[in-house]
From Swiss-Prot:
Record keyword DNA repair present: yes
Protein name (Swiss-Prot/TrEMBL): Structure-specific endonuclease subunit SLX4
Gene: SLX4
Subcellular localization: Nucleus
Biased composition (Basic and acidic residues): 90-103, 604-618
Length: 818
């Protein structure tokens, strides 16, 4: 302890009074770091146990002097060597007036406390409230830096801006000489004037003047790095070229996009406005464009063409690089001639260059077809050829030809011939059109609820005249009588044949055996005579056809093609047999659709009124046969052809008057006798009398079973046809009355806020019409509103709905009685 005390007394620092005492000897402050003394180490050990005191108070020593080494440290002190009594503060560095770094109070120098290790640094510390003030040095000159006001900085913060301004006092005040001091003092803004001139000069005094000169860029010149000198102008020109404001930058931008970005979508190009730039000759002759399209370039520029094998490649194939071709097609619609012609030549050059890389032998590539907008006249002509189909979705059909749209309006009324309403090209109910039929046709039924079945081969459709000629025409005798009449019987238009019958010669063979066959007069538009017998037809050989032809034949009969070839052949044979048995009675009503001439009808009416009984009519028919004495009856021969009796002549004359108006031949099958209908049925159903009475057929001689069945079926068809023709005019009137009644129905009153639509409103809204309800309404209210005292049946209402294209249905599935 004695050693420590002696060393402490030996190294004790002098008091502040001794340091700053006036002396002639200059004091040199040692700036080199020194080793900490033992006293400082001891104070650091003892300072940890001392109480907290004010660090700026000075205690008096035993001699009564102030001792700076007894400063009490604050409550929290640092524990590092040399900083025991210094409160922890961040080290703040500042610069003095000479630009040298200088630490503030918290800095440590020479490894000692600023108060104890280096007492001379206490002069730089300005304590608050003037506790420790460093006295100024008076006396001789010192070599050290002077303690001036510029060196005395506060301990709070460090401001570098003040140090810089202190070192440069001349640059901070620049007031122009043009503004006098008196004028600056009088700058007051109460008068409301802005004084822009003074404000501009004041702003110029402290704001540096910038270079506001604008670079003028010529958009017509070729902007390249060699031509542009300034870096700013290059950047500005590149911005212009990116937006396509110059001529030379459009194609270069396209080339860069094609080389770098492999796009998969079509890029939109401007045609109007920049069309002259795009389609100019200079653009297509530039080296950048040739370098892209010309095959002499690198192979990496051209896209590799591969076959599309995936759905994605197939869907994106249309977005390829075909901009030039598409622009040429679009340019054709513009009126400018040069702008349209030049792209085609350029595109042709591009195509030949591309095709030359693929095939060396090909020199020219085919040009793309030019698509042009059709004129207004052509568009109107195409609209005239279109056929509009109206109806519900269940009534419209699929058509593939120009004639088949007429089948869309097909209904049950077409199943039965009407007076003066059947056109020449209208098909019979058993005809089979080439294309698919409508849904109404597929399930069409007659009045007796019998479904119509189509068994006719549609591969070679026969007309009405050809079927009748091939079925019912008998061979013409080569007698002189027919040679005189044949040339006079051919005429163009249907007309009365009464004057033709008068030209038949009155002379003929007296012996009935000499002329066993009754000749048949054939009247045709073409004048050609065809002789064919029904019995002479044989089953065609279906085995010689291919499978595809067999399937087509089966489909023509309305059946689906079968897998087995044998089954299709057997099915075709059955269909052919049924066709030969059914086409004779089915085609017969179609030959009597037209009315006879008025003169012939009046003559037959007068004859019909004079006949009262069957015997009288038979005797009168025999007596009337005297005007053609050359035609007599005879027995049947082995050839299968039967001769006509005088009764046959009478029946033939009637059928001739009726049938020849359509240009069809007379019908002769075998020896027949006249069996007219009863008077009651004719008077009730047929107002025109005997004009529609057809003789029935009966066999007097033995014949085959096939002819007997044909005769019976022909009789039944004729009987049904007479009844239908009698009701034809009445059905037309009923349809008109139903239409008037539905349109005349008044609007119904709503019940409990629920509207009740009329029948017309239901039809217009495509609501299914219940036939039972509509029939009841027509019979109770509808027909009475228009003054019609009659009733309609459900079948009649159904026929009317289908003729108008109205969707109808029954309330319950039931069998409709005929």
């Amino acid at each position: 302890m004695s050693f420590l005390n002696s060393s402490r007394r030996r190294t004790r620092s002098p008091s502040p009074g001794q340091i700053f005492a006036p002396s002639a000897t200059p004091i040199v402050i040692d700036s080199s770091p020194s080793v900490p003394s033992a006293s400082s180490i001891l104070d650091s050990l003892l300072g940890e146990f001392s109480e907290a005191r004010d660090p700026y108070t000075v205690e008096a020593g035993p001699t009564g002097r102030s001792s700076d080494h007894l400063f009490s440290s604050p409550g929290v002190l640092t524990q590092s060597p040399g900083r025991e009594n210094v409160p922890p503060r961040p080290s703040e560095r500042t610069k003095d007036a000479h630009g040298k770094d200088r630490f503030l109070v918290s800095t440590e120098r020479n490894g000692r406390s600023p108060f104890r290790g280096n007492p001379y640094r206490s002069a730089e510390i300005h304590s608050p409230k003037g506790r420790l003030k460093a006295p100024t040095k008076e006396g001789g000159t010192r070599k050290t830096k002077k303690f001036s006001s510029s060196n005395r900085t506060l301990t709070g913060r460090s401001t570098k801006f003040l140090a810089k301004t202190a070192s440069k006092p001349t640059q901070s005040s620049k007031v122009p000489s043009e503004i006098p001091a008196a004028k600056l003092d009088s700058l007051q803004w109460e008068d409301g004037e802005l004084r822009l001139e003074l404000a501009t000069t004041r702003r110029g005094s402290w704001t540096p003047i910038k270079d506001t000169s604008i670079d003028i860029v010529d958009p017509t010149r070729n902007l390249s790095p060699s031509n542009v000198s300034a870096a700013g102008s290059q950047k500005f020109s590149s911005m212009l070229s990116d937006y396509g404001f110059t001529k030379g930058s459009t194609l270069t931008m396209e080339n860069e996009l094609r080389r770098e970005v492999p796009t998969t979508k079509r890029r939109l190009e401007l045609l109007q406005g920049t069309a002259n730039d795009i389609f100019s000759e200079g653009d297509f002759s530039r080296p950048p464009e040739k370098s892209v399209v010309n095959p002499n370039g690198t192979h990496s520029r051209r896209s590799r063409k591969t076959t599309s094998t995936t759905i994605t490649s197939l869907s994106t194939a249309q977005y390829g690089h075909q901009d030039s071709r598409q622009m040429s097609n679009l340019a054709d619609f513009f009126p400018s001639g040069e702008a349209v012609e030049r792209p085609s030549g350029a595109i042709k050059k591009l195509k030949t260059s591309k095709s030359g890389t693929k095939k060396k032998g090909v020199k020219k590539a085919k040009e793309a077809p030019l698509f042009k907008v059709a004129s207004i006249e052509d568009a109107l002509k195409s609209l005239e050829d279109q056929v509009c189909l109206f109806g519900t979705s269940s009534q419209l059909e699929r058509v593939s030809s120009d004639e088949e749209p007429q089948m869309a309006n097909f209904n049950l009324n077409a199943q039965f011939p009407r007076k003066n309403s059947r056109p020449q090209k209208t098909r019979s109910p058993c005809s089979n059109p080439k294309t698919s039929k409508s849904l109404w046709y597929a399930s069409s039924r007659g009045y007796d609820d019998i479904e119509f079945v189509d068994m006719i081969d549609s591969s070679n459709p026969k007309t009405l005249e050809s079927v009748e000629a091939s079925t019912f025409v008998t061979p013409i005798d080569s007698s002189p009588m027919h040679s005189q009449v044949a040339s006079q019987m051919v005429f163009e238009n249907p007309c009365d044949v009464s004057h033709v019958l008068t030209k038949i010669p009155q002379t003929g063979p007296k012996d009935p055996i000499e002329n066993p066959v009754c000749p048949e007069i054939q009247i045709r538009h073409s004048g050609n005579v065809k002789t064919q017998s029904t019995s002479g037809q044989s089953i065609p050989s279906f085995r010689g056809l291919t499978t595809a032809q067999l399937a087509q034949k089966v489909a023509s009969f309305g059946f689906k093609p079968l897998r087995s070839r044998e089954k299709m052949i057997s099915l075709l044979e059955k269909c052919w047999e049924s066709q030969q048995q059914t086409h004779i009675p089915a085609m017969l009503p179609a030959s009597h659709t037209a009315l006879p001439d008025s003169v012939t009808r009046a003559e037959q009416m007068s004859k019909r009124d004079t006949i009262k009984s069957r015997d009288i009519r038979a005797s009168k028919s025999r007596s009337n046969s005297n005007h053609i004495p050359g035609l007599v009856s005879s027995t049947s021969q082995n050839t299968g052809y039967a001769a006509k009796s005088p009764d046959c002549i009478r029946g033939s004359s009637k059928s001739n008057d009726i049938g020849t108006t359509q240009g069809s031949p007379l019908l002769t099958t075998q020896s027949v006798i006249v069996i007219p209908d009863s008077d009651d049925s004719d008077n009730d159903n047929n107002p025109t009398g005997g004009a529609y009475s057809y003789p029935s057929l009966a066999s007097n001689t033995p014949s085959s079973s096939t002819r007997t069945m044909a005769s019976e079926s022909l009789l039944s068809v004729r009987t049904r046809y007479e009844a239908n023709v009698g009701e034809e005019q009445g059905s037309n009137d009923i349809n008109q009355q139903i239409t008037k009644a539905i349109r005349a129905q008044p609007r119904l009153v709503a019940i409990n806020g629920v509207k009740r639509p009329t029948w017309l409103e239901k039809i217009l809204m495509y609501d299914p019409i219940v036939l039972d309800d509509l029939t009841v309404w027509l019979n109770t209210e509808g027909l009475d509103q228009i003054g019609e005292d009659s009733e309609v049946s459900g079948t009649t209402v159904r026929e009317w709905c289908e003729s108008k294209g109205i969707c109808c249905t029954w309330k319950k599935k039931r069998h409709v009685a005929p």
